Regions:
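Conserved non-catalytic scaffold segment of RNase H-like nuclease domains
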Residues: 1-114
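Short, flexible loop segments at boundaries between secondary-structure elements
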Residues: 116-119
């Protein structure tokens, strides 16, 4: 079985306040063993990082300014996770942001039934 362990960092805690993803990191596992396939991107959120989020991840607006946008990496991210079970700690948080980003660009959302939450 192929799985992807996924984590995100964001500009804040809520998509209702239009916070965005600033980092996506994934590793692929086959039968729980890393395959050395990795997806990692820092993202330009096109909005300021909140002070609280900066204290968590340390990514400044200046650092993120020249990074790709979610729109620019969406297809490669979709291809990386496609058909794989996704493992996320606190999945509700990460999925709310990932699916918010997908809605903004009219892409299908990640189906919760394909996700294992470690929380």
């Amino acid at each position: 079985m192929i799985e992807v362990v996924l984590d995100t960092e964001t500009t804040g805690l809520s998509t209702t306040q239009k916070h965005r993803i600033v980092e996506i990191g994934c590793i692929e596992l086959e039968n729980q063993i890393p395959t050395n396939k990795v997806f990692h991107e820092y993202l330009n959120p096109q909005r300021p990082v909140s002070e609280e989020a900066y204290k968590v991840h340390g990514y400044s607006d200046e650092f993120l300014a020249d990074k790709k946008t979610f729109t620019e990496i969406a297809e490669s991210f979709i291809n990386f996770i496609d058909g794989k079970r996704i493992i996320i700690h606190n999945a509700d948080f990460d999925l709310s942001f990932l699916n918010y980003e997908f809605r903004l660009i009219n892409k299908p959302e990640i189906n919760r039934k394909n996700v294992i939450d470690t929380l």
